Amino acid sequence: MKITLIAVGTKMPSWVTTGFEEYQRRFPKDMPFELIEIPAGKRGKNADIKRILEQEGKAMLAACGKGKVVTLDIPGKPWTTPQLAEQLEAWKNDGCDVCLLIGGPEGLSPECKAAAEQSWSLSPLTLPHPLVRVVVAESLYRAWSLTTNHPYHRE
């Protein structure tokens, strides 16, 4: 199983790249974890946000290919670490790749939401999209460590 994090936005601050890569490199070889960045549409005071969301959404879904789509969205389902570990095992047992989608400043397109088999909420708070990359990477690594009895996670 491969996990792909597909996120709108490029040129992240160095702390985001460093934080994400720290957890990415810890993943086992049999569960690769990759990041695909989708360039954000140009936004301005006269920007057609609906069109921008549609373009970003199409690019995200195209990057996902045949993987199971899971959106990261405030109205999604919150998972505890043990629940995320169970979810990780279920995805692994399904034998399919998983694509986690992080939208841009206005969120995800309706097409992305419609394509999603699941929606995961990290928090009822609105989080900065760059920070979400690091939180997701750490959360997935922690969940993996729980499934393998690795000492990283402690109750």
Swiss-Prot record:
Region forming the signal peptide: none
Keyword Transferase: yes
SUPFAM superfamilies for the chain: alpha/beta knot
Pfam families: SPOUT_MTase (PF02590)
Entry GO CC: cytoplasm
CDD domains, A to Z: RlmH-like
Record's subcellular location: Cytoplasm
Keywords in alphabetical order: Cytoplasm, Methyltransferase, rRNA processing, S-adenosyl-L-methionine, Transferase
Enzymatic reactions: pseudouridine(1915) in 23S rRNA + S-adenosyl-L-methionine = N(3)-methylpseudouridine(1915) in 23S rRNA + S-adenosyl-L-homocysteine + H(+)
Chain positions recorded as S-adenosyl-L-methionine binding sites: L72, G103, L122, S123, P124, L125, T126, L127
UniProt GO molecular function: rRNA (pseudouridine-N3-)-methyltransferase activity
Main location, first listed in the record: cytoplasm
EC number: 2.1.1.177
Assembly with partners or alone: Homodimer.
NCBIfam families: PRK00103.1-1, PRK00103.1-4, tRNA_RlmH_YbeA
Similarity comment text for this entry: Belongs to the RNA methyltransferase RlmH family.
Function (record text): Specifically methylates the pseudouridine at position 1915 (m3Psi1915) in 23S rRNA.
Protein name (Swiss-Prot/TrEMBL): Ribosomal RNA large subunit methyltransferase H
Native organism taxonomy: Bacteria, Pseudomonadati, Pseudomonadota, Gammaproteobacteria, Pasteurellales
